[in-house]
Structures are given as C-alpha cells and as structure tokens.
Amino acid sequence: MAGRSGDSDEELIRTVRLIKLLYQSNPPPNPEGTRQARRNRRRRWRERQRQIHSISERILGTYLGRSAEPVPLQLPPLERLTLDCNEDCGTSGTQGVGSPQILVESPTVLESGTKE
C-alpha cells in the first residue's frame, strides 16, 4: 500500500484475515427441515452475521483509527433542489406511468401573491 511501511501492511493483512475467519465461522444455514426450522436457522444466522459485521467494523475502526460516528453528509439548501425528468425517468417497467415531473420553483416565486 502506497505510503505505508511494510510492517503496518502485514498488520493490516492479519486484521483482514481475522475478519475473514470470523465470516467463515458462520456458514449459511442448512436448507433441510421444516419451514419453521429453516426460518429459525436463517433468523439466527442473520443475527450472527449482524454481530460479526459489528465486530468487524469495530476491529477495522480501531486499526484504521476512524471514529465510530459517520461524517454528516452536507446537503445543498432546499431552494436549489429540483425534480427534473428530461432523461432516464423512472426504472424499467415504470416508464410512462403517471404524470411527468415538473421543476420545483423557488419559494419567492410561489409566495409572490400575484394572480395570472
């Protein structure tokens, strides 16, 4: 990895191998048995996967020195947001359904109070 010493590369590889081992220790559930038994096994498996994911995030966060809280996403002001449907409107199978979207006007135009 560029800009890192070889020692920390080996430590990162060891960390990634540990996380890989955690995920490999929880194989997908057996598809045999009654519907209820399969459902319970899948539910328990998903819970273990969530726990492994949480542990993996904590291990990597500690190793990389990142904060546990995500950085807040900076959004533009609402006045600048528009809905435009000129290209790629909708997903496949829904194109042409409903009325076309229109551009949202700024609040100053909407609040002018003049009648046309």
From Swiss-Prot:
Q: Please state where this protein is localized.
A: Host nucleus, Host nucleolus; Host cytoplasm
What InterPro entries does the database record attribute to this sequence? REV_protein
| Record family assignment | Belongs to the HIV-1 REV protein family.
**Where is the stretch described as Disordered?**
21-49, 92-116
Annotated segments matching region Homomultimerization: 18-26
Organism superkingdom: Viruses
**Basic residues composition bias: which ranges?**
36-47
> Which GO annotations describe the biological process of this protein?
mRNA transport; viral process
Where Phosphoserine occurs, residue numbers? S5, S8, S92, S99
| Residue span of motif Nuclear export signal and binding to XPO1 | 73-84
Residue window of motif Nuclear localization signal and RNA-binding (RRE): 34-50
Q: What does this protein do?
A: Escorts unspliced or incompletely spliced viral pre-mRNAs (late transcripts) out of the nucleus of infected cells. These pre-mRNAs carry a recognition sequence called Rev responsive element (RRE) located in the env gene, that is not present in fully spliced viral mRNAs (early transcripts). This function is essential since most viral proteins are translated from unspliced or partially spliced pre-mRNAs which cannot exit the nucleus by the pathway used by fully processed cellular mRNAs. Rev itself is translated from a fully spliced mRNA that readily exits the nucleus.
The record's section on Gene3D superfamilies has: 6.10.140.630
**What's the domain remark here?**
The RNA-binding motif binds to the RRE, a 240 bp stem-and-loop structure present in incompletely spliced viral pre-mRNAs. This region also contains the NLS which mediates nuclear localization via KPNB1 binding and, when the N-terminal sequence is present, nucleolar targeting. These overlapping functions prevent Rev bound to RRE from undesirable return to the nucleus. When Rev binds the RRE, the NLS becomes masked while the NES remains accessible. The leucine-rich NES mediates binding to human XPO1.
Question: Any idea which GO molecular function terms this record carries?
Answer: DNA-binding transcription factor activity; identical protein binding; RNA binding
Whichever gene encodes this chain, its name is: rev
Q: Assembly and partners?
A: Homomultimer; when bound to the RRE. Multimeric assembly is essential for activity and may involve XPO1. Binds to human KPNB1, XPO1, TNPO1, RANBP5 and IPO7. Interacts with the viral Integrase. Interacts with human KHDRBS1. Interacts with human NAP1; this interaction decreases Rev multimerization and stimulates its activity. Interacts with human DEAD-box helicases DDX3 and DDX24; these interactions may serve for viral RNA export to the cytoplasm and packaging, respectively.
In terms of HAMAP family, this protein maps to: REV_HIV1 (MF_04077)
Chief localisation class: host cell
GO CC annotation terms, alphabetical? host cell cytoplasm; host cell nucleolus
UniProt-recorded name of the protein: Protein Rev
Task: Tell me what PTMs the record reports for this protein.
Answer: Asymmetrically arginine dimethylated at one site by host PRMT6. Methylation impairs the RNA-binding activity and export of viral RNA from the nucleus to the cytoplasm.
Q: What else is known?
A: HIV-1 lineages are divided in three main groups, M (for Major), O (for Outlier), and N (for New, or Non-M, Non-O). The vast majority of strains found worldwide belong to the group M. Group O seems to be endemic to and largely confined to Cameroon and neighboring countries in West Central Africa, where these viruses represent a small minority of HIV-1 strains. The group N is represented by a limited number of isolates from Cameroonian persons. The group M is further subdivided in 9 clades or subtypes (A to D, F to H, J and K).
Give the record's keywords alphabetically. Answer: AIDS, Host cytoplasm, Host nucleus, Host-virus interaction, Methylation, mRNA transport, Phosphoprotein, RNA-binding, Transport
